[in-house]
Regions:
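Membrane-embedded alpha-helical bundles of multi-pass enzymes
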Residues: 2-198
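Soluble catalytic regions of membrane-associated enzymes that act on cell-envelope
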Residues: 202-258
Length: 258
């Protein structure tokens, strides 16, 4: 007889008397999963060896719990909260266009979009295909912006910051979740995937072999987008570019929103 391997005591810290069918518990559960899938973003504020070590494993835990979600509503709300936790900051730029009311609306819209994408992934019949669908969401790049990039799972920890590391993280989560494999086979598969995705060599920084100039405008954000300042700000940038040309610079790098 094959034995199921229980790697994680999932929600064993929840008191037994708590009604797990209550709406409050379900909201807490999907939000907790979304936090696990977003942990790399927020643990970056507390950089130390401990947080860097556990970060990818928290992401794996989040993927396992996502697979354990057995209805499309849970997938939707996990995607909804992931969208908000990853992109809440996008709405802040509307402040500088006197559109303050859009600050909460924009992340909610983004949350609904990712909620729908996660829900579409649930429509796939098998759990492995659902996980593949979640993985493929990272290839959706509207407006040329690299949105939900699962590569963030490999920013910290032992896994190689490449598709090899990312794929191994997803596969580890799947085989931990999978209940039809015996304990010892499961341990062996997970270990093989771990060492397959391991980063063995430190990545060397690549430098530009160009004579470039980095321009820092030092213009405050609340002044940059005012209509009356557009011409003066543009004139400053043009002067900096012309000066760089006179200095025989091959490349001029401007601030992102210059």
């Amino acid at each position: 007889m094959k034995l199921k391997l229980n790697f994680l005591p999932y929600f064993s810290f929840i008191p037994k008397k708590l009604n797990t069918n209550s709406i409050i518990f379900k909201i807490i559960k999907v939000f907790f999963i979304a936090i696990l899938l977003s942990n790399s973003i927020y643990l970056s504020f507390f950089e130390n060896i401990f947080t860097q070590t556990i970060s990818p494993f928290l992401a794996i835990w989040g993927l396992v719990l996502l697979l354990k979600s057995k209805n499309s509503k849970q997938y939707f709300w996990i995607g909804f909260f992931v969208g908000i936790l990853w992109f809440w900051w996008i709405g802040l730029s509307s402040i500088y266009f006197n559109l303050n009311y859009l600050v909460p609306i924009i992340p909610i819209i983004i949350g609904f979009i990712y909620g729908l994408l996660f829900r579409l992934c649930y429509l796939l019949k098998f759990d492995f295909l659902r996980l593949c669908g979640i993985f493929c969401i990272s290839f959706i790049h509207p407006l040329g912006f690299d949105w939900l990039n699962w590569g963030i799972f490999t920013v910290y920890g032992f896994f190689d910051p490449s598709y090899r590391g990312i794929i191994c993280i997803f596969l580890i989560a799947y085989f931990i979740y999978e209940g039809y494999i015996s304990r010892y086979y499961k341990i062996a598969i997970v270990l093989i995937l771990f060492f397959s995705g391991f980063q063995y060599n430190e990545k060397q920084a690549q430098t530009l072999n160009l004579n470039y100039k980095l321009i820092n405008t030092n213009i405050s954000q609340n002044q940059k987008f005012l209509q009356e300042n557009l011409k003066s700000n543009s004139d400053i940038l043009i002067q900096d570019i012309l000066q760089a040309i006179n200095e025989k610079k091959e490349l001029v790098i401007l601030p992102e929103t210059a």
